[in-house]
Amino acid sequence: RIVTATTDARMIAVDKNTGQPCSDFGEEGQISLLAGMGEVKPYYYFVTSPPTLASGVLVVGGWVMDNQETNEPSGVVRAYDPRTGELAWAWDMGREGDTSLPPQGETYTRGTPNVWSLTAADDELGLVYVPTGNATPDYFGGHRTEIMDKYASSIVAIDAKTGLTRWHFQTTHHDIWDYDVPSQPTLVDITLDGALRKVVIVPTKRGEIFMLDRVTGEPLTEVSERPVPQTDLPNERSSATQPFSTGMPSFAHPRIREQDLIGITPFDQMACRTAFHQLRYEGPMTPPSVQGTLLYPGPAGGMNWGSVAVDEQRQLLVINNLHLPWQIKMIPREEDIARNEAQDARRGYGIGGPQRGTPFAARVELFGSPFFLPCLKPPYG
């Protein structure tokens, strides 16, 4: 049979020869993925990646609309019987150890990091590897609980039989940059120090690539915690350090200098240089600010959906990397309300959003000229 998930939060099974719904799967060949989710506003939850068949169950995550509010649908990961469509387990980080459907009147934990990208499975080890995003919304985290931060922007190995966590590795601490782990984890066997190791390679939006033992989650190349710039937003916090994959090549790009900026006319080049000096920018991981922050790599990467390719025979890793800086401006709630009341939609939020339930909205857009061209010299990827 062929099983697929949809953008209206269903999973459908059809006969691979006839295309007819499999009548023994759910109700006439389909199940709803909204069970246990509670209130789901239109377009706030759907599936963007196919289910993964892992040790006899179908594992599926879901996409949650970015940057709307704190109380968005859960980022729960679920597994289903591929023949009947019955729930096998649910990995809900707010109910660790409880893999069942929530009781009547309750829901999976709302606002938790979701898994919108592709997952990967090792049937021999009985593990499914899920790349996580961060708790909603993306650019402010003062409200986040310890458990929301624990599994955010991480690679998590889940026991495919039980739905329990075996290990996890975090690529960004207290992520306030939308640095989700965006790519399918790549599972390969690599010879290291004369021994064949089972490896999972984790590409990131940050341009850092982490190589981990896929049995234990232990880094197989050096990872260093380095100091990073700190937030100046009230009621926010930021991690004093962030993990850098110093034992692997980094594609996080050099720090941008003024001479790296371009324009097709003197006018837009001057506009780019003026904006560059007005934005807060202290290199990688500069936190969002009311002043406006230059973020490079931006929330599109670095690396994104495409993951990496591996030539196992020659032990070569091939990547596709993006070179585009973005700018993030945090808008105090009172100012955002005034803008909305005045119906000032001249710029909107870009790919940011109102972030209701926090003190700030966020406007996030490409660091570009008034002619909508990148301010940074090419190449762009």
What spans do the regions from the language model cover?
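A fold-level detector for beta-propeller and closely related beta-sheet-rich head/sensor domains
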Residues: 1-10, 15-381
